[in-house]
């Protein structure tokens, strides 16, 4: 009886040791004997030597991208836009997505900093691409459309990694100060010309209004 009890205890211990469970924050993919098995909820037996597992983080990653100064976005009308945008991305609880993330990203999904390195360049490129097709005024007046286009391009750019965008938010938008424009840059020189013309036109308009007001007051007197 003692031997039977001991054998049962050993078997229970081994089963407990060999059985791996997923959690809400971490799924895993088992490969090796019997092929691939994706475990999002529940668990699976993982046998040493004949099985390998890759953990996949399921948490939402928030990434803030700030473009300002010489890194600001160049718009369709050759203006420069300073922008702060927040991206929220994660691996969806879908077997195909988890499998893809395990293959392309591996354990980097568990490290927010490594994951940021993977996606931030793609997100920045999406911002630049959309900005290049809209004027500064259009971005300001159609923020929702701008975010929608950025989301579409950014989501497509990370789709092959198993990641998916949850949301994109534009936190702030402003024109880059004129001092930040580089006259030696073709795009900046065009933008500077437009800004200078606009500034001079506004000065002339203010001066005309001031003069008209002055004349009107003198005539009344």
Language-model features: locations:
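Elongated, amphipathic alpha-helices that form coiled-coils and helical stalk/scaffold elements used
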Residues: 61-221
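Domain-core and long-helix interface of multi-subunit machines
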Residues: 1-65, 117
């Amino acid at each position: 009886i003692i031997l039977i009890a001991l054998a049962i205890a050993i078997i229970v211990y081994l089963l407990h040791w060999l059985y791996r469970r997923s959690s809400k924050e971490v799924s895993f993919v088992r490969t090796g004997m019997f092929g691939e098995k994706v475990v999002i909820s529940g668990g699976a037996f993982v046998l040493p030597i004949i099985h390998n597992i890759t953990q996949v983080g399921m948490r939402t990653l928030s990434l803030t991208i700030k473009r300002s100064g010489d890194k600001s976005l160049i718009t369709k009308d050759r203006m420069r836009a300073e922008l702060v945008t927040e991206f929220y991305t994660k691996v969806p609880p879908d077997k195909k997505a988890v499998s893809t993330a395990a293959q392309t990203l591996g354990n980097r999904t568990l490290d927010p900093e490594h994951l940021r390195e993977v996606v931030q360049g793609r997100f920045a490129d999406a911002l630049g691409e959309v900005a290049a097709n809209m004027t500064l005024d259009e971005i300001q007046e159609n923020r929702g459309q701008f975010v929608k286009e950025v989301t579409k391009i950014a989501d497509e750019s990370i789709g092959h990694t198993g990641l998916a965008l949850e949301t994109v938010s534009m936190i702030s938008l402003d024109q880059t100060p004129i001092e930040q424009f580089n006259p030696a840059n073709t795009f900046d020189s065009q933008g500077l010309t437009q800004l200078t013309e606009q500034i001079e036109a506004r000065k002339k308009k203010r001066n005309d209004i001031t003069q008209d007001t002055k004349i009107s007051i003198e005539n009344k007197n």
